[in-house]
Amino acid sequence: MDSNTVSSFQVDCFLWHVRKRFADQELGDAPFLDRLRRDQKSLRGRGNTLGLDIETATRAGKQIVERILEEESDEALKMPASRYLTDMTLEEMSRGWFMLMPKQKVAGSLCIKMDQAIMDKNIILKANFSVIFDRLETLILLRAFTEEGAIVGEISPLPSLPGHTDEDVKNAIGVLIGGLEWNDNTVRVSETLQRFAWRSSDEDGRPPLPPNQKRKMARTIESEV
């Protein structure tokens, strides 16, 4: 059995115990109590699966948490703030653009647009986004630019469907790259976007995608009506 699985269960058991003591003092609100009940069922199921006693795991979890707290400073307890990173200038973000052969796809809460008339171009993807815990948090806007500075693609959040994850953004970027590469364009991603959206990338600045994914994704892009 993986040691991280066991220690994670032990810490979860102890933290549930702390929350239960809090609720016993009639300090928890309705959502708090509802989560407490659901988590209790979950812990019982995990305990049965792992073959671990919850009471014993709770004691072990207490020791782990106490050891961590002994090493913590007040500074470390502060919640990190989001950082806003910009690849694009204000002019690049606000500039209007026109598509000769418009294609559009909605992927979750993100809208992907591209001009399929663009062929045999070198294209770079730039984005403005926020970061927390050194990971992409919220995409503000992503645009695809040719070497001449023309905008040929875009990914933007849908106002009517707020909320997306870094995985949603990476999947949307994969769709956009696939569509652009289908027309023999060469696409690379800005260094800032690579750093915070992917842990690794190809030498040419292209994020890693499964083999043949670009053709599969290109076929999924639906015509804009």
Swiss-Prot record:
Q: Name one GO biological process term.
A: symbiont-mediated suppression of host type I interferon-mediated signaling pathway
Give the residue ranges for region: PABPN1-binding.
Answer: 218-225
The listed location of motif Nuclear export signal is 132-141
- What does the entry report about post-translational modification of this chain? Upon interferon induction, ISGylated via host HERC5; this results in the impairment of NS1 interaction with RNA targets due to its inability to form homodimers and to interact with host EIF2AK2/PKR.
Looking at the record, which segments are called RNA-binding and homodimerization?
Answer: 1-73
Placement of sequence motif Nuclear localization signal: 34-38
- Encoding gene (name): NS
Alphabetically sorted, this entry's keywords are:
Eukaryotic host gene expression shutoff by virus, Host cytoplasm, Host gene expression shutoff by virus, Host mRNA suppression by virus, Host nucleus, Host-virus interaction, Inhibition of host innate immune response by virus, Inhibition of host interferon signaling pathway by virus, Inhibition of host PKR by virus, Inhibition of host pre-mRNA processing by virus, Inhibition of host RIG-I by virus, Inhibition of host RLR pathway by virus, Interferon antiviral system evasion, RNA-binding, Ubl conjugation, Viral immunoevasion
Tell me which domain of life the UniProt entry assigns to the organism this sequence originates from: Viruses
Put simply, this protein is called Non-structural protein 1
Q: Which GO molecular function, any one, fits this protein according to its record? A: RNA binding
